A protein has these predicted regions:
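Gly/Ser/Thr-rich phosphate-binding loop
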Residues: 230, 255-260, 269-329, 343, ...
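AMP-binding/adenylate-forming catalytic core of the ANL superfamily
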Residues: 97, 364-372, 377-378, 385-388, ...
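AMP-binding/adenylate-forming catalytic domain of the ANL superfamily
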Residues: 489-511, 531-539, 543
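Structural core segment of the AMP-binding/adenylate-forming
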Residues: 7-10, 57-58, 81, 85-146, ...
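ANL superfamily adenylate-forming
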Residues: 25-37, 119-161, 170, 175-176, ...
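Conserved AMP-binding/adenylation subdomain of ANL enzymes
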Residues: 187-208, 216-256
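Conserved AMP-binding/adenylate-forming core of the ANL superfamily
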Residues: 22-73, 77-81, 98-103, 184
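Conserved adenylate-forming
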Residues: 57-60, 151-161, 166-211, 231-233
């Protein structure tokens, strides 16, 4: 039985040695200043064994943790698998982290080693010193320095329950939590993807999966990487999403599968149509959060399905759900229905089962004897948060969904993103989706601001396509945006305030940092670049929609 990620890789390398495991496109190679081309399983296996032996000689072993600040480079995979063979857990480090964040990570994770790009060595060493930790730092091509302390679990056998990685949540609110992910988490994620079939069926030894998503998050690291390892496929990691060259990269890479974030289809659809839009080689896209109004038009224009899925870092594939069978309910934020090995409850704020069509919090667990099978093993140094998340034997996701009469699940919003105005629950994501269709809007984030009468009012932070020239132009732009939303949404969902900003607080995966938005929003009304549009929000006359 395969017990570790390294063993899974070695098994595939023995069968598919001549096949490529990685493809680095020239654009990515130029961004990273590395060599473009393909790396075979056999060549990767040789490099990994060399690294494994070097790490072992330097004293690294079971129970150590090693940070990887390597972006989406091939070195990430080679060092990950080599360290995994010894029982060393890897801690992917977001390259955008700075002093305070690195100090927290170094202290909280207790990494013994950081394999990092040379330009970040000083930052990491300074962060570790402030955290009171002894840390070794090396470049990916260096010989490993001696371990600063003995392996904590030296002599203990490796298993599928051995910690494989420590992934930190994106930290959209509060301090990031360290999710302990065992080997089983990654093996189950790749195995799930390899077997789900339907529109997401992976053909052994034939798929070429392109992803611009960062390896510091589970989508690329657990689903994409492990699915390719377990099926003998080729992963094509990009340094990031480049809208202008995206389709050139798709064609040049000979990709058959794409992974996407919800923001990507919206950006790609803004480009002028061309005769090259149809992508016959692409079998499907895997992702989440595509704009409802763009879902069907995107598929018609580019010629492949976008399969919406739901999962979290904490759930892994222990409770993943995907719309990989028809009917997919395109354009409704549907992510399909659960398989037999996943159990789902949807509950109201009172903890009662939600009725069909009624929004409620999604609770999940794995079916069978172990409800946590395939999930994370817990939050590092935070048993209370782990227990709270698993209250009542169900994992509380914090996502608001609803189940339709045919069993399909539809995403509404994150629980903490819901705006409550005059007793009405308003989804920030829903409002953002509509506002993004306005030609003046380049990017938008919606948040609540206090209202003495209604409890909350809706505020939209808009990054305009072109900054308004003066106060009058700003007021007119705000009026146009609100009138558009009034034509698309119930009146109470339209923005009561429109603030024009230069940029939005985003995570590295281009998700809105809701914690920062929550803190930022209340201070915007009354400022020069925020237009009060509350007077435009009027309930339609009774006969207006008849």
């Amino acid at each position: 039985m395969t017990a570790t990620v390294h063993q899974a890789f070695a098994d595939t390398a023995a069968r598919h040695g001549g096949q490529p495991i990685l493809c680095i496109l020239p654009e990515t190679a130029q961004a990273y200043d590395i060599v473009a081309g393909e790396l075979t399983y056999a060549a990767a296996a040789d490099a990994i064994e060399t690294l494994r032996a070097a790490y072992a000689d330097a004293g690294y072993g079971h129970g150590h943790r090693a940070g990887l600040l390597l972006e989406n480079r091939p070195a990430f995979f080679l060092h990950w698998f080599a360290l995994n063979a010894l029982g060393v857990s890897v801690v992917p480090i977001n390259p955008d982290l700075r002093a305070a964040e690195l100090e927290y990570l170094a202290g909280h994770s207790e990494i013994a080693l950081a394999v990092a790009l040379p330009g970040r060595h000083a930052d990491l060493l300074a962060a570790a010193q402030r955290a009171g930790r002894e840390l070794r730092v090396m470049k990916p091509d260096d010989a490993p320095p001696a371990a600063p302390f003995p392996a904590p679990l030296q002599g203990t056998a490796l298993s599928e329950l051995t910690e494989c990685a420590l992934l930190y949540t994106s930290g959209t609110t509060g301090r990031p939590k360290g999710c302990i992910l065992p080997n089983r988490y990654f093996l189950h994620a790749g195995g799930w993807y390899a077997r789900i079939g339907g529109l997401a069926a992976l053909r052994p030894g034939q798929e070429r999966m392109l992803t611009p998503l960062p390896l510091v998050h589970m989508n690329a690291m657990a689903y994409s990487a492990m699915a390719m390892v377990l099926t003998g496929g080729c992963l094509i990691p990009l340094d990031r999403f480049h809208p202008r060259s995206w389709w050139d990269s798709v064609r040049e890479s000979r990709a058959t599968v794409l992974h996407y974030l919800g923001v990507m289809p919206a950006i790609l659809m803004k480009a002028e149509p061309t005769p090259q839009d149809l992508q016959p080689a692409i079998r499907f896209g895997f992702g989440a959060g595509v704009d409802r109004k763009l879902h069907a038009p995107f598929e018609a224009r580019f010629g492949f399905p976008l399969l919406e899925a739901w999962a979290m870092t904490e759930t892994g594939a222990g409770a993943v759900i995907i719309a990989n069978h028809e009917p997919r309910h395109v354009g409704t934020s549907s992510f399909g229905s659960e398989e037999a090995d996943v159990q789902v409850r949807i509950v109201t704020d009172a903890g009662e089962p939600a009725a069909i069509g009624e929004p409620g919090e999604l609770l999940v667990r794995h079916a069978g004897e172990d409800p946590r099978y395939g999930f994370f093993a817990g939050y590092l140094k935070d048993k209370a948060a782990t227990d709270e998340a698993w209250e009542g034997g169900w994992f509380h996701t914090g996502d608001i969904v609803r189940r339709e009469s045919d069993g399909a699940l539809r995403f509404v919003d994150r629980k903490k993103n819901v705006i409550r105005r005059s007793g009405e629950n308003i989804s920030a994501v829903e409002v953002e989706s509509v506002l993004m269709q306005h030609p003046l809007v380049k990017a938008v984030a919606v948040a609540a601001v206090p209202d003495p009468v209604r409890g909350d009012e809706v505020l939209a932070c808009v990054v305009p396509e072109a900054p308004p020239a003066d106060a009058d132009a700003m007021a007119e732009a705000a009026r146009s945006i609100v009138q558009w939303s009034l034509s698309q949404l119930a009146y109470y969902k339209a923005p009561g305030y429109v603030a024009f900003v230069d940029s939005l607080p985003l995570t590295t995966t281009n998700k809105i940092q809701r914690g920062e938005m929550k803190a930022l929003a209340p201070g915007l009304p009354g400022t020069a670049r925020c237009v009060d549009t509350c007077h435009l929000k009027k309930r339609p006359a009774e006969g207006a929609h008849r």
